[in-house]
Amino acid sequence: MTMNWQRNRLWRQVHSRPRLFIAVAVAVALAIFLPESVASHSVTRWLIAWNAGTVLYVILAAVMMIRSTPHRMHHRAQQQDEGQLTILVLVVVAATASLAAIAGELVVVKDMHGFIRFAHIALAGVTVLSSWAFIQVMFTLHYAHDYYAAACHGRPAGLEFPKEESPEYGDFFYFAAVIGTSGQTAEEIGRAHV
């Protein structure tokens, strides 16, 4: 009984977040099957895979966000009602692992010269950018979920958007990106729920 419940819960997580699980599957497959001639160090292999996964996820999420309407966002909030904490923990763990991998890559670089050295340093820089974009998109989805889930449960939303009754993903991305770059909340107003 417990195993069946856990399997159903896992399936609901995969089904409600296909973009995340597709990106993870592609990243893991790339890390496993990337030729050694492309990435001879394991840390380089995992950074390439991480970047491919995060960029794929950001692209898939952007396509979904562009095609979404407030009605679909409301429906998605109901569908993804569980597992929000798990997703945020995974984002923090992934970002921390990414930073550790960057540090590892920079250690590998110290004995390299010329174009190879430049390519490895560029990989570390691209990893910073792709990780930042990934985190902003994850928080965009988290903020949108919380906003519309509050409406599903009859609670006030945690954010107020000026002159906006039904904010779209672009509004939430703007909010996440402003916080992600400056720690400020711009025109949106956050409300604490006690």
Language model features with spans:
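Short, Lys/Arg-rich, polar N-terminal cytosolic tail immediately upstream
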Residues: 1-13
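Loop-to-helix transition at the N-terminal end of transmembrane alpha-helices
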Residues: 41-59
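Membrane-helix interface/capping segments
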Residues: 62-80, 103-113
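Juxtamembrane helix-capping/reentrant segments at transmembrane boundaries
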Residues: 73-93
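Transmembrane alpha-helix/helix-exit interface in multi-pass inner-membrane proteins
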Residues: 128-154
